[in-house]
């Protein structure tokens, strides 16, 4: 993060139940990082992304929050792009480049995190083009709630508090990002689908089990039918 052209004020690592070896890595990282690092942990009780995100939100005084996953590499202007595009009453969703399995292995071995042009094996490589001109043309406000990437989102903390954060009814993989998007829209917030800026590269890995999608779809459908604005189980 210290290599970002606009570094964040702090880094919060939201840890959903990792063991002590992860804490040792984070402690080592914290000592080498110039930016303050907070390690927020919760007990392993299955996939509880909404819960650990809420715990992280409670543990920061920053007024604008950028969410990323632990399996992505950030363009050096990633933070800058989110900050430059923030506006009152707006939240931002971005895209990602999906690196191939072989390319992911190569990068992990060589520790080469610089991406030059589009000469690397990946899906959605157009998402790796950073252009302020193209971004102005193709970035649009929209009301879509699906295909939202929680690994590339940003919000005002006050807006997250208004919708009571992420809904911890969602456990297992899926739909918590669609749910908070819908509740933000129900509270008259604007969603910016940011293109050709806020670039990130997703490392290949096997997908998580998706056996909770049907349950989570039912919760999302309740949010839709009830025009829900606040999380049922959220920040407070």
Predicted regions and their residues:
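Acidic donor-binding segment of Leloir-type glycosyltransferases
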Residues: 1-46
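Short aromatic/hydrophobic "clamp" motif used to bind/position activated sugar donors
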Residues: 65
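A short, conserved alpha-helix in the catalytic core of glycosyltransferases
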Residues: 147-148, 152-164, 170-190, 195-196
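Active-site donor/metal-binding and catalytic loop motifs
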Residues: 99, 194-211
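Glycine-rich, basic loop-to-helix element that forms the pyrophosphate-binding segment
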Residues: 43-60, 77
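Short, flexible, basic/aromatic active-site loop/helix in glycosyltransferases
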Residues: 112-145
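The conserved acidic donor/metal-binding loop of glycosyltransferases
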Residues: 69-73
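Conserved donor NDP-sugar-binding/catalytic core segment of glycosyltransferases
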Residues: 77-118
